[in-house]
């Protein structure tokens, strides 16, 4: 029990009303001690509310308001006796009539003393019954406040008025409709998902507000004080109540820790606090477990809890609408359409024919979703049916899964061309998908503690399936023209759907999730009618689902050998087509910021180049001489009308074969035309244009200037200052000691090519910096994003020799931060290394960049030099990461 000295004695012994401040501090310490000694969070928050009551009653009497006919009401969370350490103390002073001048003075004294105490955050309203009526009629917030107004002290005759006022000003329907619209708006503000990376545990879907919402609507109609009272009225079952109360306690407990850590009223479960709160719940990484295991398991519990709450919110409020609101509508006539012996459609929602359907016909569980998937006109599931379905889903066992009828029904759902995504989301939400595929249940709510994977694994998987389904819809053909065409000619689209369903299903188990997922998929495929050959293809897709994205991201796909090696791993067009569709859908389901026209162009180029290699024959070696001649001919055709062939060839003879192997004819013509027009002008040449293959958000910057030691470092430092993100870089040195550099950048603001003034600013900044090779612009200090400070990423540096190019390939993986590329470029410059090309990839908080370098003499580093350089680069990255974490 919580023992506190009576407030009156405490204040009397200190001879000062402000002693309430110290009293509350002492009480708060006792509450925390009680919590740490095992007292439940429910008892703690109620005790805190009661102690605040005691303080307010004391101050009420101190202001002589006990001699008035006014009433003091607790409202909001305080009205519900839900007080966390830094919760606001929301109160309402209510009067039956206009407030007298004497009482106004007393109220002023009361309010002043509240602020003088200094330990309260009061939110105060002073109203008459008439003003309550007027405000409640037009303000939903006021009406909601009145529903749970609780009389603390004062005129007991006023206790009945708050709810009476709401009954007078709002009908069941108007209040329900307004609260549901308010909830929809709140959901939209939180991305309509329970699984945000940094969820607001109070306001996001599945948060405390969803539980409050059930209470507000039920209290308005049933006139009850507690959700518990709804059990006796048949509105909620004892099981559902237990789930809600357990979830509510868990959310309160998180909020309790958030308040104490932030030392304020904080509802956002930020990265700043997730790991520490996880530890307070006992989720601590053990030896041998992944570094983020504890926090990921804690967040998994949170996401699952939020899913339970939002599902119950949906079901109970739909039940209220169907059983209370709709039947009372004027001229209401129930519309019923019989579907079959098991189901009917009632008011556009699917319902069972009788309450024993799922028990007597277990196949009806999956049949319900088959109907939903193929009837776009059905708006959802009736609440009574939903309640039966959730209970029935718990009875799905191995015998159920092994039933051929059930297996056929499941595959019919997967093959549905209409509402696959919505149907699978519903199957997951109501417990069917996780029970039918137990491995899927293991990834439900599983998050990856990073900024790259912004969805839980289960949500990502279903979004991937949604994307695949969209490839067959005409409205998305413009956005994904090539992949949509490829998808629509797949012989068996269900093969890629099953590969998608299982591609990440083994995450969180330990081991290689691709291999483990492939094993699960083979077992599933055999049971669900796929041939051995089809099962092998599904398994191959799962094992290699990252192959295409990693090749495009980390390798130079303008190199024919890279493309040939990739094509040989595929073997035929069937594997290429399936992998391409899976890869594009996967990237788009991982993080919306990850997919852009530059990345789309890389995927498209890799697909078309690999297709050409497969069609011409995998065994044929690359004929580089023919490739060079074909490229030169195509480029010359673009130039022939404007320049003499002799002038063109004069420029080209200064460039090596690699240039004509890796650059397209269009780019060669662009470069050549610019160089010829520039003539003998000693000033660096800088040109910008939209990337011809990547379109709107990717910009090509071409630089032609005398070669200099710090060319790359200077260029990326300037681009960083201009808020341009480098994605790709090629640096080619001609035999005349001139450098031809092409950078692909993403413009964060999207105005680089539409704002002439900004374009000119970028050009001038580059020309000025490159004209002063001895004046390196240096790093620009930028604000470090808050989230980055909470990720412990191991910096890695891997330096290998590319035998064919005789260049060192430097791969770095580090915590991404503003100015990283400029910092790395500066280090290369100081070490006397020339950069020939670079591939830049940012994956959430992680940067994975690749550079091809040589020494000044054009030779690669030897083993000893590699060792020394690797150590210096690693030390520099470690120093930068430490600065970020301490920022």
UniProtKB/Swiss-Prot annotation:
Cofactor: Mg(2+)
Region of interest (Uridylyltransferase), residue spans: 1-337
SUPFAM superfamilies associated with the record: ACT-like, HD-domain/PDEase-like, Nucleotidyltransferase, Nucleotidyltransferase substrate binding subunit/domain
Protein keywords: Hydrolase, Magnesium, Multifunctional enzyme, Nucleotidyltransferase, Repeat, Transferase
Taxonomy, superkingdom: Bacteria
ACT domain mapped to chain residues: 700-782, 809-887
GO molecular function: [protein-PII] uridylyltransferase activity; phosphoric diester hydrolase activity
Ranges where the record places region Uridylyl-removing: 339-699
Protein EC: 2.7.7.59, 3.1.4.-
Regulation: Uridylyltransferase (UTase) activity is inhibited by glutamine, while glutamine activates uridylyl-removing (UR) activity.
A Gene Ontology BP annotation from the UniProt entry: regulation of nitrogen utilization
Sequence ranges assigned to domain HD in this UniProt record: 457-579
InterPro entries membership: ACT-like_dom_sf (IPR045865), ACT_dom (IPR002912), HD/PDEase_dom (IPR003607), HD_domain (IPR006674), NT_sf (IPR043519), PII_UdlTrfase/GS_AdlTrfase (IPR013546), Polymerase_NTP_transf_dom (IPR002934), UTase/UR (IPR010043)
Role this protein plays: Modifies, by uridylylation and deuridylylation, the PII regulatory proteins (GlnB and homologs), in response to the nitrogen status of the cell that GlnD senses through the glutamine level. Under low glutamine levels, catalyzes the conversion of the PII proteins and UTP to PII-UMP and PPi, while under higher glutamine levels, GlnD hydrolyzes PII-UMP to PII and UMP (deuridylylation). Thus, controls uridylylation state and activity of the PII proteins, and plays an important role in the regulation of nitrogen assimilation and metabolism.
Domain remark in the UniProt entry: Has four distinct domains: an N-terminal nucleotidyltransferase (NT) domain responsible for UTase activity, a central HD domain that encodes UR activity, and two C-terminal ACT domains that seem to have a role in glutamine sensing.
PANTHER family per record: BIFUNCTIONAL URIDYLYLTRANSFERASE/URIDYLYL-REMOVING ENZYME, BIFUNCTIONAL URIDYLYLTRANSFERASE_URIDYLYL-REMOVING ENZYME
Protein name: Bifunctional uridylyltransferase/uridylyl-removing enzyme
Species whose genome carries this gene: Acinetobacter baumannii (strain ACICU)
């Amino acid at each position: 029990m919580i023992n506190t000295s009576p407030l009156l004695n405490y204040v009397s012994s200190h001879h000062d009303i402000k002693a309430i401040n110290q009293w509350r501090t002492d009480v708060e310490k006792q509450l925390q001690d009680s919590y740490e000694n095992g007292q439940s969070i429910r008892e703690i928050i109620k005790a805190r509310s009661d102690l605040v009551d005691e303080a307010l009653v004391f101050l009420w009497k101190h202001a002589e308001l006990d001699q008035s006919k006014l009433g003091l009401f607790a409202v909001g969370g305080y009205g519900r006796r839900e007080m966390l350490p830094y919760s606001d103390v929301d109160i309402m002073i209510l009067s039956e009539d206009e407030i007298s001048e004497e009482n106004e003075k007393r109220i002023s004294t009361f309010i002043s003393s509240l602020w003088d105490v200094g330990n309260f955050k009061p939110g105060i309203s002073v109203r008459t019954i008439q003003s309550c009526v007027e405000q409640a009629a037009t303000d939903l917030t006021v009406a909601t406040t009145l529903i749970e107004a609780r009389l603390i002290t004062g005129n007991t005759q006023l206790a009945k008025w708050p709810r009476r006022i709401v009954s007078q000003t709002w009908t069941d329907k108007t209040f329900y409709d307004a609260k549901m619209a308010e909830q929809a708006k709140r959901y939209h503000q939180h991305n309509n998902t329970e699984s945000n990376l940094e969820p607001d545990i109070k306001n996001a879907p599945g948060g405390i507000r969803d539980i409050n919402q059930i209470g507000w609507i039920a209290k308005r109609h049933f006139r009850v004080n507690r959700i518990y009272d709804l059990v006796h009225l048949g509105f909620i079952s004892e099981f559902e109540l237990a789930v809600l109360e357990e979830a509510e306690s868990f959310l309160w407990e998180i909020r309790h820790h958030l308040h104490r850590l932030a030392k304020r009223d904080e509802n956002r479960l930020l990265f700043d606090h997730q790991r520490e709160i996880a530890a307070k719940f006992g989720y601590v990484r053990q030896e041998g477990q992944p570094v983020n295991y504890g926090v990921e398991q804690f967040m998994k519990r949170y996401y699952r809890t939020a899913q339970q709450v939002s599902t119950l919110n949906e079901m109970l409020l739909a039940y209220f609408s169907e059983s209370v609101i709709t039947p009372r509508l004027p001229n209401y006539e129930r519309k019923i359409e019989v579907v079959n012996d098991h189901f009917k459609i009632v008011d556009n929602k699917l319902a069972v024919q009788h309450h024993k359907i799922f028990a007597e016909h277990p196949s009806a569980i999956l049949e319900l979703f088959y109907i939903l998937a193929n009837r776009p006109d059905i708006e959802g599931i009736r609440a009574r049916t939903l309640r039966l379905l959730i209970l029935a889903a718990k009875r799905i066992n191995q015998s159920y899964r092994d039933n051929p009828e059930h297996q056929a029904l499941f595959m019919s759902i997967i093959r549905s061309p209409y509402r696959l995504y919505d149907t699978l989301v519903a199957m997951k939400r109501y417990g069917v998908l996780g029970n039918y595929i137990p491995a899927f249940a293991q990834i439900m709510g599983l998050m990856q503690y990073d900024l790259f994977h912004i969805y839980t694994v289960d949500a990502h998987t279903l979004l991937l399936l949604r994307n695949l389904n969209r490839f067959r819809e005409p409205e998305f053909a413009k956005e994904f023209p090539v992949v949509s065409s490829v998808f629509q000619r797949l012989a068996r689209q269900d093969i890629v759907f099953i590969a998608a369903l299982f591609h990440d299903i083994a995450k969180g188990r330990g081991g290689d999730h691709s291999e483990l997922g492939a094993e699960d998929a083979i077992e599933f495929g055999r049971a669900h009618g796929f041939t051995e050959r089809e099962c092998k293809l599904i398994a191959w897709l799962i094992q290699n689902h990252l192959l295409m994205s990693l090749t495009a991201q980390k390798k130079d796909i303008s190199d024919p050998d890279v493309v040939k090696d990739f094509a040989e791993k595929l073997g035929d067009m069937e594997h290429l087509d399936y992998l391409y569709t899976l890869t594009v859908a996967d990237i788009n389901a991982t993080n919306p910021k990850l997919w852009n026209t530059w990345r789309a162009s890389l995927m498209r180029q890799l697909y078309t180049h690999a297709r050409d290699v497969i069609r011409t024959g995998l065994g044929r070696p690359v004929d580089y001489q023919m490739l060079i001649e074909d490229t030169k001919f195509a480029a010359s055709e673009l130039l022939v009308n404007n320049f003499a062939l002799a002038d063109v060839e004069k420029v080209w003879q200064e460039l090596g074969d690699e240039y004509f192997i890796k650059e397209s004819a269009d780019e060669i013509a662009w470069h050549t035309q610019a160089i010829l027009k520039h003539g003998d002008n000693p000033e660096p040449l800088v040109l910008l244009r939209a990337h011809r293959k990547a379109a709107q958000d990717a910009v090509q910057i071409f630089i032609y200037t005398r070669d200099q030691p710090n060319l790359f470092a200077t260029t990326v430092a300037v681009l960083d200052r201009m808020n341009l993100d480098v994605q790709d870089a090629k640096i080619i040195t001609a035999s005349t000691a001139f450098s031809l550099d092409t950078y692909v950048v993403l413009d964060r603001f999207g105005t680089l090519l539409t704002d002439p003034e900004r374009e000119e600013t970028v050009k001038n900044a580059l020309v000025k910096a490159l004209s002063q090779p001895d004046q390196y612009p240096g790093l620009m200090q930028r604000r470090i994003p808050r989230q980055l400070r909470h990720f412990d990423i191991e910096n890695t540096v891997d330096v290998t020799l590319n035998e064919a190019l005789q260049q060192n390939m430097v791969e770095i993986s580090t915590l991404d931060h503003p100015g990283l590329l400029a910092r790395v470029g500066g280090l290369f410059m100081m070490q006397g290394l020339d950069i020939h090309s670079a591939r830049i990839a940012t994956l959430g908080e992680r940067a994975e960049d690749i550079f091809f370098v040589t020494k000044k003499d054009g030779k690669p580093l030897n083993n000893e030099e590699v060792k020394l350089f690797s150590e210096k680069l690693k030390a520099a990255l470690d120093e930068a990461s430490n600065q970020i974490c301490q920022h």
